[in-house]
């Protein structure tokens, strides 16, 4: 496994020869388990997940185009029933993977799958203190679940960027 300095060199070399996008955001599913008022994602009962085969064809195309990084997101990435197979498939294609999540479905077992396939970083949405976060996401208890997911990631060696959307509800609490 390369050190941070070596990894920086790998990235610089890749950028010198790049003929395609360096990074691609790939929406794995439009489905989400939360109901944030500002978000375009839909609740679980309204939409369907794309097939695993469809996602694999997209990953194949990105690999052929020599895309370096795929950022996996949704909706909520972890609502996708085959999220672990997607991670494994993309890893086997040599893709560098990150993810975006609301954190509520992340467990230490899921983090173990992520790290087994080289996922070292991701992003989790935290929209302020507990009361504001729960109000924004439309689900009481979502803050506590997101924090447990964040802690599972950090405990398992996955670095996390915290994403915050500023709204009227949290603007004075950030």
Where are the regions that the model predicts?
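Residue-level signal for pocket-adjacent positions within structured domains
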Residues: 45, 101, 131-132, 161
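Short, conserved loop/turn and helix-capping segments at secondary-structure boundaries
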Residues: 49, 139-143
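Conserved strand-turn element in the central/C-terminal portion of the radical SAM core barrel
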Residues: 149-173
